[in-house]
Amino acid sequence: MRPWKHIVTGAMLGLAVLIGCARQAETPPTTTAPAPQEAPVSATTAPAGDLALAAFKKGGCGACHIIPGVPNARGTIGPDLTNIAQGAAQTMQSSAYTGKATTVDAYLREAILEPDVFVAPDCNGSSCQKGIMSPSLGQGLSEEELAAVITYLKNPPGETEAVISEEPAAAPADAAPTLSDEEFAWAKLVYFERCAGCHGTLRKGATGPALTPDKTMALGTVGLSTIIYNGTPRGMPDWGKQGFFTQEQIDVLARFLQREPPAPPELPMERMKASWNVYVAPDQRPDTPQTTRNWQNYFVVTLRDAGQVAVIDGDTYEVVSNVDSGYAVHITRMSATGRYAYVIGRDGKLAMIDLWMETPTKVAEVQVCYDARSVEVSKYNGPKGDFTDKLAVVGCYWPPHFVILDGQTLEPIHIVSTRGYTVDTMEYHPEPRVASIVASDFQPEWIINVKEIGQIWLVNYADPKAPQIKMLQAARFLHDGGWDATHRYFLVAANQSNKVAVVDAQEGRMVALVHTPKIPHPGRGANWVDPEFGPVWSSGHLGDPAIVSIGTDPEGHPDYAWKAVRVTPLPGAGSLFIKTHPNSKWIWIDMTLNSDPVLARTICVIAKENPTEPHTCWEASTYGRAVHFEYNAAGTEVWVSIWGDASKPGETGEIVVYDDATLTEKVRIPNLVTPTGKFNVYNTVHDIY
């Protein structure tokens, strides 16, 4: 493994990327024009101000920056430009400054034409990233426009001054850009596949911001294209820079986002049952495992762009079976016995795989949503009945409902809508999506998180056709989470609320709302014992370069219970998953959605005995993104996915297996098609993380 070298983090300094941002390959290298002699600051004249305003609008600068006096310039990706000129002198004198400018004019010019020469330390309270702003910005500005922008930033209008010109906050619907039928159909499909998970099917926002026309029209095609191409430091992928989309495709998406979102159809029970297939009936399945392999150490691996999962032998690293599943599988959950793997695709197709067969085989499937993220099974076995392997539940993004199914055949039994009212403003929400679901050991209950309205539902499945539901008030934008080490308390991130909600599954009540850094994204989290604070549960973040650890021991360490007791800094934000094991001395974390490609493929480990900073970080690959960790059943190995590009032979993806004790690489499982999540049978059944 290569040693990690310090990677400068921060944000772009200057303006948003202009029209040339996504055409880097088409334009010659930018050279910095000589800075003119600095003139005394004076009020911006109307013609110069109008020219600057036109330049800001031309480039969609307000998509990334707050710019005083510029209508709708309220972006938060880049730094606030309100006082950039006033702070230039102090910055240039700082030892951290890496540029060459000696005057304010030269500083602003450098920031526009050579944005990575110096990366500012702060972007609206978050660490910012190198490489977000393209140097090809200068190609889109004439010398007159550049001079006007510099003059404007040196003397922007005050709070009480009128803006130079006005425009409506949102353009009328009939002013939205046009799309051909072919373009509209393509953009609609791509939005569902790549964007709806964070921004919502109706584009009302969740993990990502709302993309309704009242928001997007103000940014315009160029501003939207800038963000789509470059991504953001808060977790949005850089679709253009990665090569997922061409400039022409990005332009189509930007125009699509300024139109009203198309209304998706509902999915009634009749249509669900029409999609239901049982390929091997329960009485035709084996009574005992037919394989000599250690099936409890199988890994079920998502092959995202192949529409498959690979079942890999954790002892031999062999691919035992590739099984067709739904599109872009989000998660796999095991039945309570571990025999069956329930695989949910983002297209709402649920596949059931029998791991006892000599070759793991799909035995049933059904589609209960058009967009989904979660599946869980019934696990309770106690005084109120034995529900082992009897039921399953799928949580849908669209339509907003969950569906209870027969756990042996996947026959749909009952549908429950999640439409309702938000916990904070009590406003009706038409699209409250179902996020994570976990199964309680204390009751025949599922804990179902209803994202947009901020409610946690305790769903009693003892009577699956008439489930009893207790609604707990938490915080909006609930997403993913997991159990504490005792499996009594469930912790779930309300990511855009910057909180973690805590539920006591034994008593069926809310315990706490814990404030965290920006946009917590724990996956299932990581349970470990902090040397100072005792048992904790930890999460990474999309919006901040940090790990938060929350005390989880109200009996042994009551002073620290349900408080954020430690924040461990990371080299970058964009973390999706964190993982540990009771037998390990390490905590592993990724930065998958960081806009810096080096950080996106970098993984870090934190020593439990010294959790104040990363023990070491390294690049796991020379391409793609490092994502998601999973231990083998013994807790001696860690598997990490290299999420590649299905269109690039040799770089489609692989899994890297590390020795957990020494952090040394053991083996690579190559030539997998965009592997992402991995689910070890034993660890998934027993909720070990």
Region locations from a protein language model:
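Bacterial N-terminal signal peptides that target proteins for export
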Residues: M1-A11
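Post-signal peptide N-terminal segment of mature Sec-exported envelope proteins
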Residues: P28-A54
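Periplasmic/extracellular electron-transfer cofactor-ligation site
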Residues: P47, L53-T102, L113-Q129, N155-P168, ...
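C-terminal capping alpha-helices of c-type cytochrome domains
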Residues: Q129-A169, Q242-E270
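Predominantly soluble domains enriched in secretory-pathway, periplasmic, or organellar proteins
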Residues: A173-D181, T201, S225-T226, N230, ...
